[in-house]
Every structure is written in structure tokens, then in C-alpha cells.
């Protein structure tokens, strides 16, 4: 596990809140994502995944949401402040033999804060991204409560992983403007996964992809990687055309392999 003490404390605080609210329904909580793979970057979230054995009642959704709004930091994160938390809760029955796309019982992320502060409740969502999260989490997740990840997290068939990437592509590419760094790095990681079947960090995927790209597109992707690592300013004002060309190149590479 490569998270520092502050992030571990934040993950443990969130886990304690989840346990106190969901109580006997909670089977496990796992830490996954950057904290357990390549290390947390300046804007990385603390990614948590929980498994429950029964649907979450609205009253418990409200309590869990209130706790997460309090514990999670806001985006974009300032240096030294709490990190954003992303929590996905899955019903054990929904993932025992996963259908496509996988259904999440509850999702919290800072991109949804405005809606949640307007009193919207997290609701169950079926989304290709859920399938990809489970596939990657099974490979790397660390238990904060409950048994080893392979006890509950299913092995996602390769054809479902490929279908999830295919179905997630249009929305991902459409969100490029304003989220250039994340979209380009996610496309690079999709290319890597579609080519090899494995999951690696965004910065490692960018390095892998850039070595196989034309110089201009590679330079744009490297800029995204360096911004992700905190080495350069995350500024795309004068790189709109370059980011679009790079996204188009990466998208085509992914589609060729799916």
C-alpha cells in the first residue's frame, strides 16, 4: 500500500463511518485505485469499494451521504487538504455473477457534490464504468474491513471488460473539454488494457502509449502525464486542438482492438 499516513487516516475514517451506518449489512470495505497501485498523485482520490448483503434504505443513504460530504475533500484539492473520496457500494447478489453493465447500489464522488448538497440522494446505477472498476479492484484492492478482495469481487470476463471500454468511449471523449488531462490518460489506459488485458496506473499507461505515438500526439499525452504527476501546470488553454487530435488518435487505437 503506497498511501501516506494522512490518506490512510482519511480512508479509515470513511470506513468507520460506513461501518457505523451500514452495520450488519456491511460485508467488506476495500481500498483500491492509486492508493494501492502506483501511489497517490496530487489530485488522486481515495477510492473505496464496499459490499453489502441487502439494499441500502433511503434513511441510510442520507446518513452515509452526510458522512461522506463531511469527510471528503473538495475538488480541486489544495495542497495539504483532505483528498476527495470516491465510494462505490455493491450489493453482493448483483456481483456474484455479474451482468453487464454491473449495477452499483450507491456511488459517491466529488463531481456529484453540487447535486448532493441540493438534497439529491445517490441512487443505484448500472454503468460500464462499474464493470471496469470491479475488474481493476479485484486485481489490486486491499481490505480495510472484511476478507480478501477475491472473496467477494468477481472475476470479470475479458469480453465484458472490452464491452465496457467500448460503451464508455463516447461519453469519455465527449467530456474532453474541461477534463483534458483525465480523459487523455484514461484513453491511454484503455489502449493498454485493450492491448494486453492488464490494468496499470495512468502515468505508466501514458508512458507506454507515448512510445507508440507520433511526436506531436505523444508530446500532448506526456504533458497530461506530467500534469497528473504535479510536475507541470494543468493548463490546456492553448492546447485545445492538440488535445482533440490526441484524443482522436487514442480513441482509434482502442477501437481497433475491441
Would you name each region that the model predicts?
Residues 1-29, 59-65, 258:
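Helical scaffold of the NTase/Pol beta-like nucleotidyltransferase catalytic core
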Residues 2, 52-58, 175, 193-194:
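A generic structural motif
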Residues 18-23, 37-42, 77:
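Short secondary-structure boundary/capping segments within folded domains
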Residues 29-70, 74, 84-91:
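Catalytic metal-binding acidic patch
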Residues 66-177, 184:
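Conserved NTP/Mg2+-binding pocket subregion across the NTase superfamily
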Residues 198-258:
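Structured mid-to-C-terminal alpha-helical surface segments
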Amino acid at each position: 500500500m503506497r498511501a501516506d499516513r494522512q490518506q490512510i487516516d482519511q480512508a479509515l475514517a470513511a470506513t468507520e463511518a460506513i461501518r457505523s451506518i451500514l452495520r450488519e449489512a456491511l460485508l467488506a470495505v476495500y481500498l483500491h485505485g492509486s492508493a494501492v497501485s502506483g501511489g497517490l498523485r496530487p489530485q488522486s482520490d481515495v477510492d473505496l469499494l464496499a459490499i453489502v448483503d441487502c439494499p441500502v434504505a433511503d434513511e441510510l443513504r442520507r446518513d452515509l451521504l452526510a458522512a461522506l460530504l463531511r469527510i471528503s475533500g473538495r475538488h480541486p484539492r489544495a495542497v495539504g487538504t483532505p483528498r476527495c473520496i470516491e465510494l462505490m457500494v455493491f450489493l453482493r447478489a448483483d456481483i456474484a455473477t455479474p451482468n453487464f453493465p454491473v449495477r452499483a447500489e450507491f456511488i459517491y464522488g466529488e463531481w456529484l457534490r453540487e447535486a448532493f448538497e441540493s438534497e439529491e440522494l445517490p441512487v443505484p446505477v448500472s454503468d460500464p464504468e462499474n464493470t471496469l472498476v470491479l475488474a481493476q479492484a479485484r486485481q489490486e484492492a486491499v481490505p480495510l474491513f472484511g476478507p480478501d478482495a477475491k472473496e467477494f469481487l468477481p472475476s470479470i470476463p475479458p469480453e465484458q471488460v472490452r464491452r465496457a471500454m467500448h460503451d464508455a468511449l463516447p461519453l469519455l471523449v465527449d467530456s474532453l473539454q474541461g477534463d483534458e488531462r483525465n480523459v487523455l490518460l484514461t484513453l491511454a489506459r484503455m489502449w493498454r488494457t485493450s492491448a494486453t488485458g492488464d490494468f496499470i496506473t495512468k502515468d505508466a499507461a501514458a508512458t507506454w502509449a507515448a512510445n507508440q505515438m507520433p511526436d506531436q500526439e505523444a508530446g500532448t499525452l506526456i504533458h497530461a502525464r506530467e500534469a497528473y504527476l504535479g510536475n507541470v501546470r494543468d493548463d490546456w488553454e492553448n492546447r485545445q486542438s492538440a488535445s482533440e487530435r490526441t484524443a482522436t488518435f487514442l480513441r482509434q487505437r482502442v477501437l481497433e482492438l475491441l
